[in-house]
């Protein structure tokens, strides 16, 4: 309860300081708002979202206290998933907490191994905004301080240095770990465009370093927020290309003295693929007033294929981008955590022991901690291609 009151206080301070801040609640972050944060807009955290984070954290602690096997908390990660690293025996003693912290520090340090050129700071901010929002969904089980730190870093202009090369299994593990390393006062960050030691920046900005415990390390490193930032950047560029492409095509068609027949309303209605008629209408509007609408005896009956089929090319490119944006919106507003921490989880199929074992109920918390494959970004990856 003390932690929750402190979190609420921090949120209130942020809200007062940032009247025009983008409020995050884990549910409805738009790509437009995410880009605003990337460009420097401050953030605030909705109180109900931080309440979800607190309840999720309480559920994880109670589960650990009751001897449940929890990936990344009471057992290791990766190849060490069957190796017990924490045994609470019904009590979260100082010794148990110390062991948890050692494991978290070790996990962040051992995975901060990316290399190569550093990621554009705007994309780092975008990735952090995405991860903060997905944390606020309540599925990670991290302590509220982790969410607060994401907000503090964004609001105080502290941007972790993230090298762009390196991969380990699924998700952005070796890249995102550098965010956690900066939060614990290690590694490097950018402040006002200058690279400085994280410890120095945290002290100068009056940011208290994270003391990671429980599922904190896993929650910070095991997600796909960096990949989503890169995907959103590509989608944004594609959107800009598609915005000007009809104009470029119209100018080119005029230069060719081309034929408007392939994108007439009669033509596309005759073969009505999704989006085709809308794109054809856009091309006709671009060419409104053009000399191409006047009959010309020298004009070809049919243009070269590259011109004749452009309406299909642009239509399908637009459909692909629309589909990609839909799954991006799902990805940045839901939990990709493994395991997923679900407060007041749906009890479907709990008549089976295999399912019932994931559920926990204590005087303080009720829900489930379930192994997931939600780190899989195949829906986004396929549409990105």
Label the predicted regions.
Residues 1-20:
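Gram-negative bacterial Sec-dependent N-terminal signal peptides
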Residues 21-67:
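N- or domain-start disorder-to-order transition segments that initiate the globular core
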Residues 22-31, 199-222, 282, 286-297, ...:
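Acidic, low-complexity proline/glycine-rich segments
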Residues 49-69, 149-164, 205-210, 364-372:
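Short, hydrophobic/aliphatic alpha-helical segments
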Residues 79-101:
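Glycine-rich loop at the start of a catalytic domain that most often binds anionic cofactors/ligands
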Residues 109-273:
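Active-site cavity-forming subdomains of large catalytic enzyme subunits
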Residues 253-385:
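Accessory "access/gating" subregions that flank catalytic or transport cores
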